[in-house]
């Protein structure tokens, strides 16, 4: 059951990132979409979150919702171009390892990010540690980095 929830979460997370970029391309309210994405997938509103995004150098960690939003849509931190605005055409799970215990759920694996209308892919390693909130998984710790 918990493994199904992890699979569903990862699918929803990937679709959410793609959707933000799609709304941006179409001239829609991508900020609203990104805020909804963060509220749905990250536990910023319920607890402390540790977030180390894939492509950060100057401000390495984004441990609050405002800074996480900047990473995904490029607003408040100068190095942010908007990770979700690339836009991505597909995000595919390449490898998944899980740890499911009584009070801990974690996923570690790789995702293949393919930009919209471009054939190159970027392989990213990720670790998500989840907290169950109202029977829903949300990210409490997120670390990701490119696989080079």
What are these regions (language model features)?
Residues 2-6:
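Membrane-proximal amphipathic alpha-helices
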Residues 18, 112, 135:
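Residue-level marker of positions within ordered structural domains that often coincide
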Residues 82, 87-118:
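Functional cores of ribonucleases/endoribonucleases
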Residues 100-108, 116-148:
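Short beta-strand edge/turn micro-motifs at domain boundaries
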Residues 24-97:
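A solvent-exposed, acidic/Ser-Thr-rich amphipathic alpha-helical stretch
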Residues 17, 49, 59-60, 73, ...:
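Extended aliphatic helical segments
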Residues 17-25:
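Secondary-structure edge/capping motif, primarily at the C-terminal ends of alpha-helices
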């Amino acid at each position: 059951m918990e493994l199904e929830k992890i699979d569903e979460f990862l699918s929803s997370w990937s679709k959410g990132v793609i959707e933000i970029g799609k709304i941006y391309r179409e001239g829609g309210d991508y900020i609203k979409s990104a805020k909804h994405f963060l509220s749905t997938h990250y536990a910023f509103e319920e607890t402390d979150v540790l977030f180390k995004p894939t492509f950060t150098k100057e401000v390495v960690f984004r441990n609050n919702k405002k800074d996480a939003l900047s990473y995904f849509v490029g607003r408040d931190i100068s190095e942010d171009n908007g990770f979700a605005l690339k836009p991505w055409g597909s995000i595919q799970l390449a490898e998944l390892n899980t740890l499911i215990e009584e009070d801990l759920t974690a996923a570690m694996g790789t995702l293949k990010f393919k930009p919209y209308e471009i054939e190159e892919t970027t392989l990213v390693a990720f670790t998500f540690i989840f907290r169950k909130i109202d029977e829903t998984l949300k990210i409490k710790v997120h670390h990701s980095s490119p696989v080079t």
